[in-house]
């Protein structure tokens, strides 16, 4: 923790530098960052699970305390307005004493609607950063989530500090422990529901604490890209297992996927081929490389796998050009990762917010940036038997290039996705997921 505290000091210095830069450009006195506030369920007296503003948790690992605020100007010590109501119904957050507390000036707010007493007097020249524009209106903010400020902050979020990288290594380490436990549960005959409970128990995080809804899919359910239904009974025949699950550490996410075959067969061989291909793509990552080019290269490598496994026929380039590979691999290669699972800034060409759209033939790609040092990205190629997409191939001559007998053999297995979390360094890549022991 002492090492993390040292890195945190440097992290805060960098965030202050960024704020000083953008507020000077925009003639702002500073930023007032709202952690957020609870959302009440419709016609109910209960709230939805709280999700903190990512721009708030960028500054400090407070992810579960709504109605808190940060006042930052890039020069003075940040002010944390920390919500501690008098409340006998709920757990009230303790006064902060962790490693980060000495780096902020803490003031305690007991009533959420009294926050104006703690805010700068010249509020007109401060920008509100947060979700609740109605609150910003009441407080008198004229500058609310300025595009220029958000574009600048989101663009630079891709450049992770040493503190952020340390947090992401830890979140990967935690998730790997869960993945290993889930794999064992699968081979021991657990249901989807039971596997998820094993995973959450292994990482000591609840469903509302992990960074996204875990995907635990057996057999053909693995073909559903965002499957979260969770069957509570085991299938009569156990064929395959796909788990896409992460963990949280100090507000930073990991996002890891693995696929398994219950027995040695063609599907297991296909997993081996996809695993090898994924590592080849990771080896291509370095500063200056376009993420779009990596995605396209993945399609060409997948095309050769489809040919090798007699799933499709023809030449690899033709399978890509005709969109046949997209029917088997419809999503993007991956995305930026950090405070959010799909971290902001993946489409930004510069700090002014210039947008780089995904290629028309690959509309679901979530990142179009050029790789640079200290970026963290996921690499997650997949191959699936998705009938609604394959049906489109049957509408034209492309059907002749698909071996439907092999498709029928693979259909009960659903699909494969293999996802690692990778840091781009100046002279190498750091595969955090594999480094913590989650290999094939």
From Swiss-Prot:
It catalyses: Xaa-L-Pro dipeptide + H2O = an L-alpha-amino acid + L-proline. It is an enzyme of class 3 (hydrolase). Keywords: Dipeptidase, Hydrolase, Manganese, Metal-binding, Metalloprotease, Protease. GO terms for molecular function: aminopeptidase activity; metal ion binding; metalloexopeptidase activity; phosphoric triester hydrolase activity; proline dipeptidase activity. PROSITE patterns: PROLINE_PEPTIDASE. Binds 2 manganese ions per subunit. It holds the Pfam family Peptidase_M24. Mn(2+) 2 binds at residues 244, 255, 419. Its cofactor is Mn(2+). Belongs to the peptidase M24B family. Bacterial-type prolidase subfamily. Splits dipeptides with a prolyl residue in the C-terminal position. This is Xaa-Pro dipeptidase.
